[in-house]
Amino acid sequence: MADEKENCVRMTRAATKRKASMEAAIDKERINKKRVVLGELPNLSNIKKSRKATTKQKKKSVSIPTIETLNSDIDTRSDDPQMCGPYVTSIFEYLRQLEVKSRPLVDYIEKIQKDVTSNMRGVLVDWLVEVAEEYKLLSDTLYLAVSYIDRFLSLKTVNKQRLQLLGVTSMLIASKYEEITPPNVDDFCYITDNTYTKQEIVKMEADILLALQFELGNPTSNTFLRRFTRVAQEDFEMSHLQMEFLCSYLSELSMLDYQSVKFLPSTVAASAVFLARFIIRPKQHPWNVMLEEYTRYKAGDLKECVAMIHDLYLSRKCGALEAIREKYKQHKFKCVATMPVSPELPLTVFEDVNI
């Protein structure tokens, strides 16, 4: 009995020491984090951008898709249980309905906002990319945060002094929804150089949740991009990582432009895939029957959205917003932001495909 008590004491003391050591390490890491003020972002040169790509690609043979292969869903053929092969058709049917239900107003800046401009929104999104890199957050967290911002601004008027508060609080909510170990409120106060208090962020969190009616799982372009990218790789004998990173880059670029709000997330995802295939193989038609079947978009349906992303890629729009561009110039993302592209999109690429 005495031995058991002694062992218990030893275990308790050991556990206490381990806990104290972990807390000290966390405090040290928090102290080392750089405070980031929204207005200072263009001058930041040493902000951390070290989210390691953990996606592992499984090698598989490449075959040219035929009409017959359309009957065999690529998700059903996948050996990844997370793809939910048996239910994928129903899941994506639901997501297509949900994206329409949860979309923001396409002209909320003109109709709802009095103090916020499209340029302010772009600067905010660019800053949130820096925040996501600083805390090594998932891309889904960033997409959700931006969607919460657009949805909230479609419902409530916000003055420009509180726009950053809306952005950082949206990132907090998205982190809680997506991340295993999300940053806490103090972290988000710190990253804004204590521009806002903990109480202000908590109050804004409640306001956002009530305005969105606690509906936080809305699909984003990243939701559809995963599946569309898999289809796009079926007839490409090239690095799958390069295709994935380029599609992700184009999709993230779209968030900078307020005009992207008028497109459904699935439209943005399909347009990113379309333009990525054009960039990689400019002499080949970027669309095919298989992509048309899975995305439910014809090439002509994507013309306006593809043109918008193409302008963003060439820095014709939002050229001063560099966070996403610098992020994808890194070798860990295959430097996809530096890939050359034609300054003009031939009209022939938007013709319907018959084979």
Swiss-Prot record:
<dbReference type="InterPro" id="IPR004367">
    <property type="entry name" value="Cyclin_C-dom"/>
</dbReference>
<dbReference type="InterPro" id="IPR039361">
    <property type="entry name" value="Cyclin"/>
</dbReference>
<keyword id="KW-0131">Cell cycle</keyword>
<keyword id="KW-0195">Cyclin</keyword>
<dbReference type="GO" id="GO:0051301">
    <property type="term" value="P:cell division"/>
</dbReference>
<comment type="similarity">
    <text>Belongs to the cyclin family. Cyclin AB subfamily.</text>
</comment>
<dbReference type="GO" id="GO:0016538">
    <property type="term" value="F:cyclin-dependent protein serine/threonine kinase regulator activity"/>
</dbReference>
<dbReference type="GO" id="GO:0044772">
    <property type="term" value="P:mitotic cell cycle phase transition"/>
</dbReference>
<dbReference type="Pfam" id="PF00134">
    <property type="entry name" value="Cyclin_N"/>
</dbReference>
<dbReference type="Pfam" id="PF02984">
    <property type="entry name" value="Cyclin_C"/>
</dbReference>
<dbReference type="InterPro" id="IPR036915">
    <property type="entry name" value="Cyclin-like_sf"/>
</dbReference>
<protein>
    <recommendedName>
        <fullName>Putative cyclin-A3-1</fullName>
    </recommendedName>
</protein>
<dbReference type="InterPro" id="IPR048258">
    <property type="entry name" value="Cyclins_cyclin-box"/>
</dbReference>
<dbReference type="InterPro" id="IPR006671">
    <property type="entry name" value="Cyclin_N"/>
</dbReference>
<dbReference type="InterPro" id="IPR013763">
    <property type="entry name" value="Cyclin-like_dom"/>
</dbReference>
<keyword id="KW-0132">Cell division</keyword>
<dbReference type="InterPro" id="IPR046965">
    <property type="entry name" value="Cyclin_A/B-like"/>
</dbReference>
